[in-house]
Amino acid sequence: MPLRLDIKRKLAQRSERAKSVDLHPTEPWILSSLYSGSVCIWNYQTQTMVKSFEVTELPVRSSKFITRKQWVVAGADDMFIRVYNYNTMDKVKVFEAHTDYIRCVAVHPTQPFVLSSSDDMLIKLWDWDKGWMCTQIFEGHSHYVMQVTFNPKDTNTFASASLDRTVKVWSLGSPDPNFTLDGHSKGVNCVDYFTGGDRPYLITGSDDQTAKVWDYQTKSCVQTLEGHAHNVSAVCFHPELPIILTGSEDGTVRLWHSTTYRLENTLNYGLERVWALGYMKGSRRVVIGYDEGTIMIKIGREVPVASMDSSGKIIWSKHNEIQTVNIKTIGADNEIADGERLPLVVKELGTCDLYPQSLRHNPNGRFVVVCGDGEYIIYTALAWRNRSFGSALEFVWSLDGEYAVRESTSRIKIYSKNFQERKSIRPPFSAERIFGGVLLAMCTNDFICFHDWAEGRMIRRIDVNVKNLYWADSGDLVTIASDTSFYILKYNRDVVSSHLDGGGSVGEEGVEDAFELLHEINERIRTGLWVGDCFIYNNSSSRLNYCVGGEVTTLFHLDRQMYLLGYLANQSRVYLIDKQFNVVGYTLLLTMIEYKTLVMRGDFDRANALLPSIPKEQHDSVARFLESRGMLEEALEIATDSNYRFDLAVQLGRLEVAKAIAIEAQSESKWRQLGELAMSTGKLDMAEECLLHAMDLSGLLLLYSSLGDAEGLTKLTSMAKEQGKNNVAFLCFFMLGKLEECLQLLIESNRIPEAALMSRSYLPSKVPEIVTLWKKDLQKVNPKAAESLADPNEYPNLFEDWQIALNVEANVAPKRGIYAPAKEYIIHAERPNETLVEAFKNMRIHQEEVLPDENGDDTHEAIEENGVEESQEDAVEVDVEADGSTDGTVLVNGNDTEEQWGTNNEESLA
C-alpha cells in the first residue's frame, strides 16, 4: 500500500531564480540565494522577507546558515566567499576563495569548518577560528565540482558530486579521496547522505535524468530511480520520513519510498525548473528552490507516534524501529520537577513491517496497533508479536477491546476481541474519519454520526466539523474538538437504551436526546484526555489546561509543542511528549479534580470531607475555583495566601478579617484600601485607624474636614510638615484659621509670590513684610521686575480700599479661632457671596439710599448734622457684630458660603 502523507504548502514566494535554500533550526526562516546576486531570508510564518543581503551583481549559487555564530555564509560567481551576521546585518568576512564560480558551500555540524567547491575543480576547507584560513585543498575531480556534503553519521568524511560523472568520498586530513562511485552516464549534479542509522546509503542526481542510491560500504548502486524528463538537479533523503525527494529541471519534485523505492507522489507548482532542496532534522518541512521562486511544503503531521498504557509503559516508533520506555523505572527517590525531562532508559522492542503513522494501546494495554501505508498490524505489547493484520486507512478501539477499521470512505468493518470480523457498515455518506470509544463515530467535513458497536445502529447525528473526539472512561462525557473550539457533551445512554429497546424509530438525525450539550469552550485543542470528569488538554497557545464543569484552569505554560500521553493516578502526574521523544510530567492532583467535580455537582458535604486530603499548598487553587463559582465565603475559609485572603475579605465586606490580615502584613496599600472601604461603609473610627497606618494624609484630610475634627486637623498638620506634604499642611492651617502659619509655610516653601497674594487677600498687614522678601528674592533674577513691585505703605493709592482692608483684618482677627457649629450652616449659606470690604461699602451705599425723614433730610445728612457719623473702623465693627451671627463667622472676604477668609471658618467645624 502507498504511503498516505498529507502534503501542505506553507509558503509560496516568487523571486529571482533560487539556486540554493536552507532552513534555520530555531527561527521560522528560509535562506534563499538568488541568481540576481542577493541572499534573502523569508519568514514562513508571516510570509514576509525579514532580511536581504546584496552580495554581488553575479549569481549567488550557494548559501548556508551558521547558527552557532549567527552567520550566513555565501559563495558566488565572483569567486568570493562572504560571511554576514544575520542579526546585525554586518559583513563579517570577505575573501577570494577560488579561481572560478563557487558552486557549493557546506558547514560542518560541530567544527569551525566550511567546505567550498568550485568550477576550478577544487574543494577547499576553511577554518573560521583561524581567520578563515584555507587549511586543506582536495584535488581529484576532472570537471566542475557541483556539490559537497558532510556525512551526518561520520562528520570526518564528506562526499562530492562532479560533472566528471563521479562521486568521491573524502576524509578530512587526507588530500586523496577514499573511493569513487562511478555509475552515471552524465555529469552528477547533487549528492546527499541517508541520515538514519540502519543503512549506509547516499543518493546522487545526474544529468542522465536519474537518481541513484548507493551503498558506500559496498560501493555498489542499490537502486536507480527513473522517471524525470530532464536533468536531476537536487536530491535528499528526508530525515524524518521514509521518503526520498528528487527535483529536476522538468519542474517536478518526486517523492519515493526510501525502502521500496516506489514512486509515492509527484509535485509540480508551475515555477519552472527545480534547482535546490532544503530540509532540517527534526522537521517535516521541505523547501524547494525554483526558477521563479521558493516553495515550502510540510509532509505529514509532526505529532510523535507514541502511546502510553495505564501502567506508565510508553511505546513509540522512530521510522520503522519500535522502542519502549517505562516511567516506573524512575524510582520514588528521584524527585523530578514539573516540566523536567525524564531520564528514561530506551529499549529496542522490535521493528515494524510498515511505516507507522499511528500507534495506540487497546484499553487494557495488552495489545498495540500500528497503522500506516493503508494497513494495520496488531502486536502484543510485551513481546511485540504479530497477532492480526489487514487493510485499513484508519483503526480505532472500543472501550471493551473491540475495534473498527475504515477500509475506504464507503466501508467500515467492526471486529470482535478475537480479531474476527463481526459486522460491515456502508455509511450513506463519505466517511472521511472514524473515532472509537463508547460509540463508533464516523464523520465528514460537515457532521459526525455516532453508531453503537453491537448492531451498528445510528444513535445521533451532530452537525459540526470534527477534528478529534475524546471519551471519558465513564462513557458519560465526550469532548468534540473542532478547528476553533471544543464542546463537552453528556451521553444519555439510559435514554438511548430505553428508546431502542422500546422499538422507537431512528430517523436521519438519530435519537434526539442522546446527547446534551454541557459546555462550549473557545479554544483550539492540540491533544486531550479525560481523567474522571476532568478534561485535560493542551491548546494552540502551548498551555496545559484542565476543564471541570466548564471552568478552565491553566496548569502550566509549555515552552514548546507537546502532546499528551496519559495520566497516572498513583503518581498524580500527567505526562506529555515532544516530537524529539522527550517525556515530561506535571503534577495534577486527583483529589483536586474530585473535589472540583463534587462542587460542580453540588455535593458540598463530600467535597468538604475530601478537602483535608488536598495539600495545603493547593488550597489557594481550590479557593480560586470556589471564587469563580461565586462561593466567596468558602473561598475565604480555605485560602492561605494573605494577599488573596485580604482581597476576598474586602469583596465580602469582612472588615475585621481584612484588618487582622493588614495588621499582620503591615502593608500601606492594604491599610489604604481598607481605610477607603471603611470610610465608604461609615465605619469612621476604623477608617481613621487604617489611614493613620497607611500614612494616607490626603484621606485623613478628607476625613477630619468632613467630621469637623479640629484636633485631628491639628495632629495632621504636624504629620504633614514632618513628611513634607506642604499642600496638606497648608489646607489644615487654613481650615484652622491659622493664617500666619499659612504664610510662613509659603515662605518656607519659597512660594513668596503666592504668600504676597495671600497676604493681600487675608492678612493685608503682612503685605509690606512679604513684598520686602519678594523684592529681595526677585532681585537675584530680575532687578527691574523687583523694582516694579509696589509696597502699599509707600503707594497706598495703588491698592484699592487698602485702609478698609486693614480695619477689617483688625476686627476679624480675634474671632478667627472660634468655630460655628455645623447646625448653623444654613444661616451662613444664605448670606450674600461678598467680601467684608464689599459688605462694608454696600452698607454705606445702603445708608445713603435710606428714605428722607419727616423734615425732608435723609438719614445720612441728619447724621452729619448731629456729628454722629461712624468712622470706617466702627462701621466694620458694627457689620461684624450686628449681622445676627456669632463670633467672627463672617469672613474677611465676606464669602460666607465658601468661608475663604478665615483659615478654619468651615461652618461644619465643631
Curated annotation (Swiss-Prot):
Top-level taxon of the source organism: Eukaryota
Protein localization: Cytoplasm; Golgi apparatus membrane; Cytoplasmic vesicle, COPI-coated vesicle membrane
A GO cellular component annotation in the UniProt record: Golgi membrane
Role, per record: The coatomer is a cytosolic protein complex that binds to dilysine motifs and reversibly associates with Golgi non-clathrin-coated vesicles, which further mediate biosynthetic protein transport from the ER, via the Golgi up to the trans Golgi network. Coatomer complex is required for budding from Golgi membranes, and is essential for the retrograde Golgi-to-ER transport of dilysine-tagged proteins.
Protein name: Putative coatomer subunit beta'-3
Family: Belongs to the WD repeat COPB2 family.
InterPro entries: Beta-prop_COPA/B_2nd (IPR006692), Coatomer_complex_subunit (IPR050844), COPB2 (IPR016453), G-protein_beta_WD-40_rep (IPR020472), Haem_d1_sf (IPR011048), TPR_COPA_B (IPR056176), WD40/YVTN_repeat-like_dom_sf (IPR015943), WD40_repeat_dom_sf (IPR036322)
Topology in membrane: Peripheral membrane protein
Composition-biased stretches (Polar residues): 886-910
